[in-house]
Curated annotation (Swiss-Prot):
Source organism of the structure: Borrelia garinii subsp. bavariensis (strain ATCC BAA-2496 / DSM 23469 / PBi) (Borreliella bavariensis)
GO annotation, cellular component aspect: cytoplasm
Gene Ontology molecular-function annotations: amino acid binding; ornithine carbamoyltransferase activity
Similarity comment text for this entry: Belongs to the aspartate/ornithine carbamoyltransferase superfamily. OTCase family.
Binding-site positions, carbamoyl phosphate: 56-59, 83, 107, 134-137, 269-270, 314
Pathway per the UniProt entry: Amino-acid degradation; L-arginine degradation via ADI pathway; carbamoyl phosphate from L-arginine: step 2/2
Protein name in UniProt: Ornithine carbamoyltransferase, catabolic
GO BP annotations listed: arginine biosynthetic process via ornithine; arginine catabolic process to ornithine; citrulline biosynthetic process
Enzyme class: transferase
Organism taxonomic ancestry: Bacteria, Pseudomonadati, Spirochaetota, Spirochaetia, Spirochaetales
Length: 327
């Protein structure tokens, strides 16, 4: 049996294509079992803490439902109501929680923080998001690509927008490892780190994949199987004017989707600013006249959109990670 027991899930570069393939297959099996009502609980008696410096809907719910479905107990530690970083360092917190819990999930700012948790807790630690990486999201992205396209190898996927964000960075790694034809369509100012790009291209040579970083719409989008985008301003940032000026021509709209294949699917990790039904969306419209920021309402609500498949798959993929490393 494939063994990932006691491994932390911090960075996709820590894992091989076989590791990721195993986790995807387990995710699919767990999803089928849940729908069939025959899921076997493998985490009875286990206790997990999740530390969230950044608020979340999908990530928190996915961790909690994954734990409940598998019979584990879970404790949520938010940005308020604890002493982490105020009266107690993360190093000391890690050593305390490691004595109490069997695993720890983290969603926050610094990659160094989640690595500190893993180094000092001596239990598996799962990265639910940092400023530079979002590895659990990428498993949830790869799963619907395979569900809708039949396989991963050679699938052409283009990411439109901020090429240096945590989702773009992690997609770059995951697609390179798993052999996809991955393109980033972004302004040169927001190209990913050159060292990361070189690493991804090296991995793609081994996997049969391909990496393209470009500000050419035609080069990036033509004949794409998957079109992906993310918000233009990350949590904790507030530079909307600069981003809109830089990225307004990288919005996913009908023109972009018409350049992709007719069968292309649209993906977004959520939350998405696609209408005027949020405070941010309305504020941006009032200031800049943009209805829909990184994606238009037309594309978000189209038959090609699989955004809610991705959201659901967060449960199954996080569950697979926890079961594989703790069960």
């Amino acid at each position: 049996m494939y063994n990932l027991r006691n491994r932390s899930f911090l960075n996709l570069l820590d894992f091989t294509s076989k590791d990721i393939r195993y986790l995807l297959d387990l995710s699919i099996d767990l999803k089928k079992s849940k729908y069939a009502g025959i899921e076997v609980q493998k985490l009875k008696g286990k206790n997990m803490a999740i530390i969230f410096e950044k608020d979340s809907t999908r990530t928190r719910c996915a961790f909690e439902i994954a734990a409940y479905d598998q019979g584990a107990n879970i404790t949520y530690l938010g940005s308020r109501g604890n002493q982490i970083g105020v009266k107690e360092s993360m190093m000391d917190t890690a050593r305390v929680l490691g004595r109490m819990y069997d695993a720890i999930g983290f969603r926050g700012f610094s990659q160094q923080t989640v690595e500190c948790l893993a180094n000092y807790s001596n239990v598996p630690v799962y990265n639910g998001l940092t400023d530079t990486a979002h590895p659990t999201q990428i498993l949830a992205d790869l799963m619907p690509i395979e569900e809708h396209k039949g396989s991963l190898k050679g699938v052409k996927i283009v990411f439109c927008g901020d090429g240096r964000g945590n989702v773009a960075n992690s997609l770059l790694k995951g697609c390179a490892i798993m052999g996809l034809d991955f393109r980033i369509f972004a302004p040169k100012e927001l190209f990913p780190d050159s060292n990361l790009t070189l690493k991804a291209k090296s991995l793609a040579l081994d996997s049969g994949g391909k990496i393209t970083i470009t500000d050419s719409k035609e080069e990036a989008v033509k004949c794409a199987d998957v079109v992906y985008t993310d918000v233009w301003v990350s949590m904790g940032e507030n530079n909307w004017e600069d981003r809109i000026n830089l990225l307004r021509f990288y919005q996913v709209n009908k023109e972009i989707m018409d350049m992709a294949k007719d069968s292309a699917i649209f993906m977004h990790c959520l939350p998405a600013f696609h209408d005027l039904n949020t405070v941010v969306g309305k504020d941006i419209f009032d200031k800049y006249g943009i209805n829909g920021i990184e994606v238009t309402e037309e594309i978000f609500e189209s038959k090609n959109s699989v955004v809610f498949d991705i959201a659901e798959n967060r449960v199954h993929t996080i569950k697979a990670i926890v079961v594989a490393t703790l069960g």
